[in-house]
Amino acid sequence: MKSLKSRLRRQDVPGPASSGAAAASAHAADWNKYDDRLMKAAERGDVEKVTSILAKKGVNPGKLDVEGRSVFHVVTSKGNLECLNAILIHGVDITTSDTAGRNALHLAAKYGHALCLQKLLQYNCPTEHADLQGRTALHDAAMADCPSSIQLLCDHGASVNAKDVDGRTPLVLATQMSRPTICQLLIDRGADVNSRDKQNRTALMLGCEYGCRDAVEVLIKNGADISLLDALGHDSSYYARIGDNLDILTLLKTASENTNKGRELWKKGPSLQQRNLTHMQDEVNVKSHQREHQNIQDLEIENEDLKERLRKIQQEQRILLDKVNGLQLQLNEEVMVADDLESEREKLKSLLAAKEKQHEESLRTIEALKNRFKYFESDHLGSGSHFSNRKEDMLLKQGQMYMADSQCTSPGIPAHMQSRSMLRPLELSLPSQTSYSENEILKKELEAMRTFCESAKQDRLKLQNELAHKVAECKALALECERVKEDSDEQIKQLEDALKDVQKRMYESEGKVKQMQTHFLALKEHLTSEAASGNHRLTEELKDQLKDLKVKYEGASAEVGKLRNQIKQNEMIVEEFKRDEGKLIEENKRLQKELSMCEMEREKKGRKVTEMEGQAKELSAKLALSIPAEKFENMKSSLSNEVNEKAKKLVEMEREHEKSLSEIRQLKRELENVKAKLAQHVKPEEHEQVKSRLEQKSGELGKKITELTLKNQTLQKEIEKVYLDNKLLKEQAHNLTIEMKNHYVPLKVSEDMKKSHDAIIDDLNRKLLDVTQKYTEKKLEMEKLLLENDSLSKDVSRLETVFVPPEKHEKEIIALKSNIVELKKQLSELKKKCGEDQEKIHALTSENTNLKKMMSNQYVPVKTHEEVKMTLNDTLAKTNRELLDVKKKFEDINQEFVKIKDKNEILKRNLENTQNQIKAEYISLAEHEAKMSSLSQSMRKVQDSNAEILANYRKGQEEIVTLHAEIKAQKKELDTIQECIKVKYAPIVSFEECERKFKATEKELKDQLSEQTQKYSVSEEEVKKNKQENDKLKKEIFTLQKDLRDKTVLIEKSHEMERALSRKTDELNKQLKDLSQKYTEVKNVKEKLVEENAKQTSEILAVQNLLQKQHVPLEQVEALKKSLNGTIENLKEELKSMQRCYEKEQQTVTKLHQLLENQKNSSVPLAEHLQIKEAFEKEVGIIKASLREKEEESQNKMEEVSKLQSEVQNTKQALKKLETREVVDLSKYKATKSDLETQISSLNEKLANLNRKYEEVCEEVLHAKKKEISAKDEKELLHFSIEQEIKDQKERCDKSLTTITELQRRIQESAKQIEAKDNKITELLNDVERLKQALNGLSQLTYTSGNPTKRQSQLIDTLQHQVKSLEQQLADADRQHQEVIAIYRTHLLSAAQGHMDEDVQEALLQIIQMRQGLVC
């Protein structure tokens, strides 16, 4: 609804320029699916979706669609601040305009979204941009009655007196829209009160014309000129008279009187002053000097008091205005929502009215058809009386006239106010009803009115009870709303407390930053003092240390950023997969529901068809009884001929049926072969179970993938730590610094993850295609069912039209005879095709001729006349009925025969196609086994080569581990030596700190060991699970292999298998290449590590020689060595045990991988197997259903043929008995026949009367049901509307609670991040203290040895440059910090000015997001 309103608003705007249209068309041409998704997400306000789509390449949120609007414009017009933040962070041209020339600032000002406007102004959006009407954003804000947006625009330099195309300023538009507060605000900001448009009209004139009293009053108070004239010579009083507003006229009169009095006083003033001056000069000169001083002091005091009061009042007014603006925005949004709901209600009402009209029209047509049906039945059953026909014609005509009159009359008129002709339409046409007097009619009407009033009273009581119930519910809802408000107030208080805590932490962080500054200044002074007496070598070492620290920090930050990006990408991919799975599940459920609905509808339609067939049979029986007596003999001979001919046809049909059965048997055999191939088809229940298991497995695999990714990340981190340790060793050795900078670790885990995710996406796409195919097949089945329903309805209507009165019966008989002739021609054509069965047909024709000769005798024996009379009558009636049934069945059989032929032809074609495919696409088992054996040999060779490479790789890894262990041992020995040096030359405090650090490292190592043991237990459990799953898969694969050995293999499967194997071989080759590369890399690393080890040993020896020269105490060194060696040995033993466990796990994993690969090579993938299974199951089900239907039809036909044969034999026996006996005259026979027919006609008349009475009773019952249903529908609509309102209110409450919980969660996260930042600051302070200690130690060394002055000057220069760079970094950090604090304070001030509304919550969310970004 909102999108429709926005479109209508755009259509109301005057036509844009050609350039805007051309741009829109150009952008619309480039519009793609991502732009459409982005537009839908922006309209829904889905921030996550918007950010995910913006992350893709080539997405531009400023692109215009066909309607000339962009995503950026939609977000700003709806006031969605989070989406707008996402778009602005992504990057967009802020000055982009739509087809009306409006940019985002115009739209934010037009719809009163002050926060969006503030955000756009922060991104330097121009305020002077004008649309095609020449209006700026200030014009739109003045029209939208949004004072906060006007204040923001004016603060950012928007021109208050800007004019549009018509020359109107924002003040003119505000007065025209009757916005007095905005008029006052604009005047305070410097708006010209007397500015004129192109017709020289002022704001006062337009306010008088449109009757805006408050705005006119504000203008007059602020000095608007009343006497100005426009281009036509009219003043403001003329416009006030046009507006017919007496209050404005009185205001103008008072203002004009005040101005006239002032002018008169100004004119008279000089003469009076001259007179007074002449008389009073002497008196005033003495006292003036005394009083002036006191008056000036008093006035100054009063001015200061008034100024303070004015300031307070202005502040209070601003606060109140902000509150009022917030409330107005909320009211506007609620009004929009209410308007949308009302429009939707009106649409639903209109739809309900249209459906009720359609229902009434259908009921009327049903009643008319029933009347016609009665009319036709009376024509058939009656003996041709004209009176009854005319009477029913009159009834039908009067019913139609009554329907037309009821449609013409208005629904508002009650039933008792209508005319008697409307209430009693038959009263005018029937002269037999004149006996009723008018008094009796009036009494009946009064009784009807009383019943109507009583029903109305009952309805009124029911409605009152329902209203009371709803009032109670509303009260309960009001109580709940109050409770929710109280809860929200408490949560708001908690949020305010949290804000205060955040402020405190910000201040503490500022203090820590200041401490850092002081530390750096102290360092600077210390360095400058030591530079005067320092060494060149020491300065170089300090430089190296600083560079190393910078490199470490930069590398760590880059690696952390990479890891974060990888984690975010993985989370996005997992979320997308979850959404896709949910969508697929929902689509599956929806399709299952549609299937159940279709089956229900099919069953209902089948029941209706059976009922209609029963009715048709009853009507055919009635028609069979309504044949006249005179034409019985002619019909007898013709029917006997037809019976004989149909017997022949039945014989031919039986032969054709046998042929079709033989073909069906062949098809069954082929189907059995196909079934043998697909013996393992699954039932739908089992399929669902398997599907659920697979979904569980997929979920478990997803979890395993996430765990593996975490393990990979941990391994990467450990590798990175090892390389960092190597770098530290290189820095100490001074020789390998340049070489280690060029070596980096390759990150290939992301590529493997991408490949796995691509495979999963392909599987999901295949599933989607299968679901869509099923959906299309179900749609086709639905269309077929609808066509069958239409054909059945047409057959029913055809049967209704077939029952014709006896006058037209002869014509129909002639038409039937012509049809019979045509059928004979068709049968003659079929006879030509069936030449083999002519002998049996000739025998049957000879027998029929003999029967005809025997029936030609016109006399019956006397003795058995009375006994045979009843039997003949019964048999004749039965034969007539059965013949009619046989006619219908014969026609149905012909149609079905044609259909069966078509199906047989289709099946033959399919068989031929399948045979051709089998010849072209099938391979013998020998060839397939030869190919499989060759492939298995190649796979074994590849696996053997892989095993060798893996063995080499493991050996290389073991050697690397040993080298790492040796490097660690050497490193620890160097650490012990350094600690000894520090103990000798440094104080005891540093030695204690080292011991503490060593204990902390021991604790960390123990924790890591415990974590690794836990991981090992988890991995063992996973291995067990994998073994169980592999056992299950093995069993399934063995069963599949047993089934596949007995069956032929399709070329498609073999091709697919070959492709899969080729792919796998390619993948294995790639893995071989990768492993070989890794092996070479490992060798290179090994050689480098050996070289490093040699160099480090040489360095250690050099250090030991130095230590020997310098007398070190051996007791401390030996104690430290013992303690360190003990801990190192323990750690080595634990590491070795862990490595052994890890190698065992790797061996088990490789074995499992090999088993899986063998199973994959020897089996078909499950997805393909399931797809083929489903396709064959569908085909088999369809063929089974068709075969069952054909078998049932053939059984019915065989039963009918057997019945006919038994009847023919009975007739033959009766004829033989008649020949042996004597013959009686036909006159008696005819007399008895006429008596029986008269009895039958009388019974038919009675039946017709009973049917009429039954139908009248049914009509009365239907009318009563319709009234009850209409009353129930109205009640249900009321209930539904009230429940919807209740649900909407509950949803709003839930949304507010969710936003509050999100705020709490984000505040907690920000607190955690602030703590992390504090920890980092403390770590930096510790590093600074360590540097100080190192410098102090070096300063002692520098005092012993002296150097020349040139080196000292160079050292001083370099140190000064370093200090300057550090100062610049500190200044930049301070600036960023102060900018953040400024933004934070502005948001806090906006929160402190009013309550915690939605806007303030959004601002707090923005602050928390910025804090997160700064911490990161």
From Swiss-Prot:
Ranges in coiled-coil conformation: 286-374, 438-1386
One Gene Ontology term, aspect cellular component: extracellular exosome
Xref: PROSITE patterns: ANK_REP_REGION, ANK_REPEAT, T_SNARE
Keywords of the record: Acetylation, ANK repeat, Coiled coil, Cytoplasm, Cytoskeleton, Isopeptide bond, Nucleus, Repeat, Ubl conjugation
Spans annotated as Disordered: 1-24
Localization: Nucleus; Cytoplasm; Cytoplasm, Cytoskeleton
Something else known: UACA is a possible target autoantigen in Vogt-Koyanagi-Harada (VKH), Behcet disease (BD) and sarcoidosis that cause different types of panuevitis.
PANTHER family: ANKYCORBIN, UVEAL AUTOANTIGEN WITH COILED-COIL DOMAINS AND ANKYRIN REPEATS
Protein name per its UniProtKB record: Uveal autoantigen with coiled-coil domains and ankyrin repeats
